[in-house]
Amino acid sequence: KDGLSSNRVNDIFKDSEGFMWFATASGLNRYDGCQMKVYRSHNLDLGPLPDNCVQKVQEDGKKRLWIRTAAGYTIYDSKTESFNRDVHALLWEAGIDGIPALTYIDKNKNMWFYIASKGCYLYIPESQLLYPLLFDAGQLPEGEITDISECSDGVLLVYNTGMIVCLNRDTNK
């Protein structure tokens, strides 16, 4: 009766507090072991989610969830149980100008942002250091990055052409 909001599940994530999060085609679902709570955007301008098609859930070092939808990101703060859709302002504070097409949080809680037509940014929250890896500076091959993941040597950038670039964790090259 109180199951998932959609049978199309795009991502499953367990946060540091033990909640299970299900990114579905019809909202974000949180399971606490007993009940399912569904977050949907009934008004796309004011609701918690920019879009109901939720694609990915990740947790940063401050225990905030970065939620990717078909229309952009929102950040869920578990302390206040509130959503913040102004991701641009948060990134601006870190020195990043642009809206991320992709965000990846690695095992060390470092944050990788892909900004279309610009490149990637590695942000290390612990030291508040920002490393731009930009197309026009020749630091990355130009193209559209469709996924960011991790391997034993570093971080993988997957391009829409099928090209895969591995960035060394220590040198970011």
Residue ranges and their predicted role:
Residues K1-K173:
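Carboxylate-rich, polar loop motifs that coordinate divalent cations or form catalytic acidic clusters
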